[in-house]
Amino acid sequence: MRRSLAPSQRLGVRLQPNQEFTPPLLQKKNKRTCQQEQEQLQCQFALRDATNSNGSIPLPIRFTANSEYELAIAKVLARKFKVPIANYVPDYGGNRCLGVRRSIVRRALHDPQACNALVLYTPPVYSEHERMKMDPTKILVHVVVDPLLSNILRPHQREGVRFMYDCVEGKKGNFNGCIMADEMGLGKTLQCVTLVWTLLRQSCECKPTITKAIIVSPSSLVKNWEKEFTKWLHGRMHCLAMEGGSKEDTIKALEQFSMNTSTRLGTPVLLISYETFRIYANILCQNEVGMVICDEGHRLKNSDNLTYQALMGLKTKRRVLLSGTPIQNDLTEYFSLVNFVNPEMLGTAADFKRNFENPILKGQNTDSSDKERERALEKTQELIGLVNQCIIRRTNQILTKYLPVKFEMVICVRLTSVQLEFYTNFLKSDKVRRSLADCNEKASLTALADITTLKKLCSHPDLIYEKMLARDKGFENSQNILPTNYKPKDLNPELSGKFMLLDFMLATIRANSDDKVVLISNYTQTLDLFEQLARKRKYTFVRLDGTMTIKKRSKVVDRFNDPENDCFLFMLSSKAGGCGLNLIGANRLFMFDPDWNPANDEQAMARVWRDGQKKPCYIYRLVASGSIEEKILQRQTHKKSLSSTIIDNNESAEKHFTRDDLKDLFSFDSKILSDTHEKLKCKRCLQNVQTKPPPEDTDCTSHLSQWFHCSNNRGLPDDILAQAWTASKCVSFVFHHRSQAQAIKESEETKQEAEDTSIPAKSKRKRSTTPESDDCNDEDFKGF
């Protein structure tokens, strides 16, 4: 306080030494007033004492009862509260300290009798006499999925959650792991979120089953997992997502997660990439973990790689592996996946190969004997009986209940005269012939390079222009094949049959509809040509490949999926965005070149026909007629037949190709309409003209022999392709089929607009995830 504001200064009073200061602001009470207040208090005390002497309830202090009425009111107000329960004895805590929990009846976290409740465990029914004898702390309760999740799960997802819970809790046998092998788009992520949330929150013993879990995924999907947990749980749980950051921060966060054993862990779920887990496995493998989930689990197909071995060192018995394609190349890879989740279920690798793999593969060939086929069938059934205990698989036929119809087409495109001359000269080259003669069971790196060269040539001569200039192997005498007006940096679609067809179809789509298109290739060089074509025709586009950062990918996908955005093309590297990416903003997809691994193509082609799609979808697979691309397609058919036999339990999977057929990669017939159709030996076609339709119970998941076969543009389900066939004159043959009938009924407004404009109406949809890293090598090539 300032001295000028002090009372002594304001009042002008000077204090003498040893004189007490009297505040001038307090009013002095006179003696008469004080005496009156004391008399009133004495009267009140006397009244209270008088009532107490009669055994009645004491009146409130300072309450003056001037009449019987006022006295009655005073007695009511002074009465203590009494709990309206018969024979109730109040408990005021006694000698218990704060924080001591009262003994309560054990019960489930959620009501098992509620509507739409998903009960994962039902305890035994006890009689009242048994309950009296039992320890109250040992009574088991129901395990019920949180209604927040159970109310949004579809029937097949409820079944999947129940299956995984039974497996990880050891209720299906002497194992605690499982493989969720549902095909793309069936909601594997949501099912895992439900499982993790349930195990972290409850058990039949009224406590959490696990205290923490680790989810390992490709680096580009770490952020997507975090978004899924936030989306479905509405922020009720936080995850520790390891993406970016310094080495010191990463080590500190992982050590804290690994060492913490509290049931109240702030971030009980660790989201980490395969690469990061491998680097810091020494930290994460020190302490026990409740459960581990491996997304895109087919990355663990090789039991010898460091990532597989690092994950096997994790101290946990509960292992869940997610993969829509457990069998990609051979049964050895399948064994690695099963052995990861449940070690020793199938024995050692040598035992598995001797007891299962060799007999089954022998029976797959068309030239196998009846005895070999019978033994293969026995071993197949035995293997199925074992793995069915820990694997669940549903096909995307389930999606037909929720998604519009999908048309899938395999289009055989003729090579142009320039491509044809390049192709034949390459095969006639002495250097190429010598390298092929040296190939054994395992193809040499030289042969693999030759295969890659032919694949690029089938797409466009621009992709092999540098090899031609360098007079590389196979192009020693090919300098004069290109036209005189050829410009390497100016795309000419007329030099490639597939680019001519693509050019005509894109122009027709752009002129006659508001559909968006996804262009997918295994090579970033092909994406460069897509860009040149888009700029040439002034199409708006976005591009996603391995050079794009993960943060930018999500923005690009959101921009394309926005129905208000006019972006026409989405160019995608199959290795960068083939897994987990949602592109439901488009309903037409071109798979420009095939991959050795059918799983990669299946993953890439599933980007548009996904949950949230409202328009009919058209999938186009382009292959060069009679070329090495058709041979790759045939190899895919062989692998898919193996997968359908083991995974889908399809005993009648047809066997159309021998191994000798698959070795004939470098043969070429320029006059054939479709080498694949010829080798199918189709009984429904006469001179390449279909005379009998496929069976009614087939769809686009059936074998190519059970698809529609067209050698002309009649009967095609897509007018865009029919017009381009006539205009480009480069299509030789088409296989096509559709999914089951559309289950979602369009509104009357949508139907009317479709009738008026022949264009499916736009629907608002916006959903995104992130993709995998880019890799243009043919890593799944296994030799011939």
UniProtKB/Swiss-Prot annotation:
GO terms for molecular function: ATP binding; ATP hydrolysis activity; ATP-dependent chromatin remodeler activity; DNA binding; DNA translocase activity; helicase activity. Residues 742-784 are annotated as: Disordered. One of its GO terms (biological process) is chromatin remodeling. SMART domains: DEXDc (SM00487), HELICc (SM00490). PROSITE patterns: HELICASE_ATP_BIND_1 (PS51192), HELICASE_CTER (PS51194). GO terms for cellular component: nucleus. Gene3D superfamilies: P-loop containing nucleotide triphosphate hydrolases, SWI2/SNF2 ATPases, N-terminal domain, Tandem AAA-ATPase domain. Pfam families: Helicase_C (PF00271), Rad54_N (PF08658), SNF2-rel_dom (PF00176). A motif (DEGH box) lies at residues 295-298. The modification Phosphothreonine is found at residue 22. It is found in: Nucleus. ATP binds at residues 182-189. Residues 501-658 form the Helicase C-terminal domain. Its EC number is 3.6.4.-. Belongs to the SNF2/RAD54 helicase family. Interacts (via N-terminus) with spn-A/Rad51. This is DNA repair and recombination protein RAD54-like. It comes from Drosophila willistoni (Fruit fly). The gene is okr.
